[in-house]
Amino acid sequence: MSVQQGIDLCETYERVAAETGHTPPLWLSFIAGIYDEYLENYVRDNKVDIEGDIVRQAGLAATRKMYQILHDKRYRATIIGGGARHVRHFTEMVGGDQVVTINWKGTADVLLGRDEDVVHRFGNPVPPHVIDELLAKLPDFRRGWETGGISIDEYEDFGPVELFRSMFLKSWRSVLETIKSMR
């Protein structure tokens, strides 16, 4: 979920591929919706003076940056977008050479109900003033955006990763409880 995590994963893959000669598919997950949700929570909890429209571009901006790095450095990875919270987390990814997973409720059902043209939007640049404001006002956006913004030791505790993990574990525990109740 941070640019540095993506780079480190790709560098590790390239090193191991060179050592072993094996190049299995590499999927690099960027979960833009969860990144946005984390930052929106931070803005609310810390009363940060920033427009919601700007915050809502953060996850997709980071994904676009990582995508460009993949192509510039010729990394053999494919982005798999996930964690969609809104339709834009799918529609704004159209046009990139990537894969996106979406939820049925609130995304797929909404898309199927629309009668709209498919528009390639992924190549649209994020306005520089949006990036500048995100960098200036949201420390975890800066950490996730900048090369070297976080170290390997910080990956596990990086805010968006913590949010993703806690949501996953909550759902996993619910599944285990359901299974337990059926036995």
Segments from the language model and where they lie:
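Catalytic alpha/beta core domains of metabolic enzymes, predominantly
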Residues: 1-121
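C-terminal extensions of enzymes
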Residues: 119-183
